[in-house]
Amino acid sequence: MNNLTLEKKAQTRNLRKTLQGIVIRTSPKTIMVEVETAYKHKLYAKRFKKRKKFNTHDEKNLAEVGDFVKIAECRPISKTKHFRLVEVLQKKGEI
């Protein structure tokens, strides 16, 4: 492959979805992260909060319940895991 195709692949890899949320459950090498998004109704302009839970791969078991983390989309690791832990942004006790 030439350098141009490698650069294009790297660019598409960087376009993967990244989310931030709170860890609500842990188990070996897996965490469940709850991500909250806010949106506005198109017609009535009322604001809503939507919560979604993602099973996330945590290879080194770095995250604990209550931590604020950053996760990124990746290849399917199992039937329900399609995200991986990028970093722990804030520990539970820190402000």
Curated annotation (Swiss-Prot):
PROSITE patterns: RIBOSOMAL_S17 (PS00056)
GO MF term (any one): structural constituent of ribosome
GO cellular component terms, semicolon-separated: cytosolic small ribosomal subunit
rRNA-binding listed as a keyword: yes
CDD domains: Ribosomal_uS17
Keyword Hydrolase part of the UniProt annotation: no
GO biological process: translation
Superkingdom in the source lineage: Bacteria
Alphabetical UniProt keywords: Ribonucleoprotein, Ribosomal protein, RNA-binding, rRNA-binding
InterPro entries (alphabetical): NA-bd_OB-fold, Ribosomal_uS17, Ribosomal_uS17_bact/chlr, Ribosomal_uS17_CS
Quaternary data: Part of the 30S ribosomal subunit.
Family membership noted in the UniProt record: Belongs to the universal ribosomal protein uS17 family.
Function according to Swiss-Prot or TrEMBL: One of the primary rRNA binding proteins, it binds specifically to the 5'-end of 16S ribosomal RNA.
Protein name as annotated: Small ribosomal subunit protein uS17
